[in-house]
Amino acid sequence: QIWPNPVAGGPPFLFAERAERDAPFAVLSYGHGDVVRGYAAQWHAGLEPWTMVVDGDRWYGRGTADNKGQHSINLGALQQVLAVRDGQLGYTFKLLLEMGEEVGSPGLREVCEQHRDALQADLFLASDGPRVAAERPTLFLGSRGGVNFDLRIKLRPAGHHSGNWGGL
């Protein structure tokens, strides 16, 4: 389903659900499909933001690291679960994708309030964010949100260490 954005001029939301009869629980996965500008001149030789390039086990393309690659992994995992469980997940799966995350998520709160019942779930999965190391999967609990602020500082006249005792 395509849900219109309740904020005028805001991009739409995509909602999908695979409901299974007598499912003991529901999983809601969230992510975004929008990307930042391509910055074509900043890509390495042989790569560009407009063409997907697969090099061994790496994918290069606009949005592959934020957030489309994560969606590909999650949907591929669901496909594998369905394959080994005779077409059944054993739970209800819901997916909410927004198209305005890179510009502050206009309308996200409102659309979640409007569709509260449809978004009801027992587990929330958001595959977005940093990893401790590339080869080490990392689980963060509660890392969503954004803050905008202006910072004014008054520097001391000399150089100081920026650690715990430096006062910066």
What are these regions (language model features)?
Residues 10, 35-37, 102-105, 131-134, ...:
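Flexible loop/turn segments at secondary-structure boundaries
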Residues 132, 141, 148, 161-168:
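Acidic-enriched catalytic cores of C-N bond-cleaving enzymes acting on peptides and small amides
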Residues 59-61, 157-163:
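Short small-residue beta-strand/loop micro-motif enriched in glycine and branched aliphatics
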Residues 1-64, 84-91:
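Acidic/His- and Gly-rich active-site-bordering loop/insert found
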Residues 58-59, 63-142:
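Acidic/histidine-rich catalytic neighborhood of metal-dependent amide-processing enzymes
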Residues 149-151, 155:
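Mobile "lid/hinge" segments at catalytic clefts and subdomain interfaces of large enzymes
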